[in-house]
């Protein structure tokens, strides 16, 4: 009895999910000669699978699918039928917390967990993939927490991540994606005045993003859509925030400046449900590199 009810519920969710993602054929269809990368904070991969993640992953035909906040333990990694040739999970030492994953259509040259110094290990927050043409860094940036209690650690993280990306960039172009846990400018948050100095919109965190862009990286969405308001990637579950589009743009793709000529598209799939975040993505034409 419970199984039948659960199946019907899942089928209903998946039908809604398919209807919603069908609004994005230009973003989610394979294009010869192009690289498509999608990032999504799934807020628990097992829960998101029940809400249609597998269907989305198999249907959107991304070359790389990067997930954050997977909340899965190494001994319980889901063996789902995703249409990717290669995958890696990086789990936190604390069970049911944080975590990142990367799915790829082809096996990369190398994969690395975390980044120096070792202070940042243990929470499963970063995976670096090396391909022939670029480094891809998938990250789930620490939240500064209530009262900005973890802001000093967050500031150190931002500084160390910036140095790491700059070192990679000397070797190959870099793509950084993930939940960066900051709304950079007022245009990136529905209610900037009410959230001044809240976690994710503090002056310090916003400055950290500014320093990263000044270090030679480009916010792909703002590069192509510099003045478009009301584009968000996270909404609180409270008070119908998503239905009213009272959100924050916390999820990004940043690229090395020399990849800008390759940038074909940057998009936010705000109608795709399954998490309190929605997927974001880019399309690159690496023939222009």
Regions found by a protein language model. Name each.
Residues 71, 77-144:
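Structured beta-strand-rich core segments of catalytic domains in phosphoester-bond hydrolases
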């Amino acid at each position: 009895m419970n199984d039948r009810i659960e199946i019907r519920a899942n089928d209903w969710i998946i039908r809604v999910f398919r209807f919603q993602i069908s609004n994005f054929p230009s973003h989610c269809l394979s294009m010869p000669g192009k690289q498509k990368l999608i990032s999504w904070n799934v807020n628990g991969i097992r829960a998101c699978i029940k809400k249609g993640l597998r269907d989305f992953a198999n249907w959107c035909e991304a070359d790389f699918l990067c997930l954050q906040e997977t909340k899965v333990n190494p001994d319980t990694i889901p063996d789902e039928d995703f249409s990717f040739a290669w995958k890696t999970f990086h789990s936190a030492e604390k069970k049911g917390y944080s975590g990142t994953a990367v799915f790829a259509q082809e096996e990369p040259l190398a994969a690395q967990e975390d980044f120096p110094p070792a202070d940042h290990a243990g929470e499963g927050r970063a995976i670096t993939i090396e391909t022939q043409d670029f480094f891809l860094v998938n990250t789930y940036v620490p939240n500064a927490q209530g009262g900005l209690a973890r802001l000093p650690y967050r500031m150190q993280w931002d500084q160390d991540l910036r140095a790491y990306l700059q070192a990679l960039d000397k070797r190959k172009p870099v793509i950084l994606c993930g939940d960066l846990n900051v709304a950079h400018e007022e245009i990136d948050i529905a209610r900037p005045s009410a959230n001044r100095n809240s976690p994710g919109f503090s002056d310090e965190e916003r400055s950290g993003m500014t320093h990263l862009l000044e270090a030679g990286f480009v916010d792909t969405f703002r590069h192509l859509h510099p003045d478009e308001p009301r584009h968000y990637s996270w909404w609180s579950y409270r008070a119908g925030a998503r239905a009213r589009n009272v959100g924050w743009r916390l999820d990004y793709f940043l690229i090395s400046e020399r990849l800008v000529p390759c940038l074909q598209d940057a998009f936010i799939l705000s109608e795709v449900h399954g998490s309190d975040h929605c997927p974001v993505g880019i399309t690159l034409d690496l023939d222009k590199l």
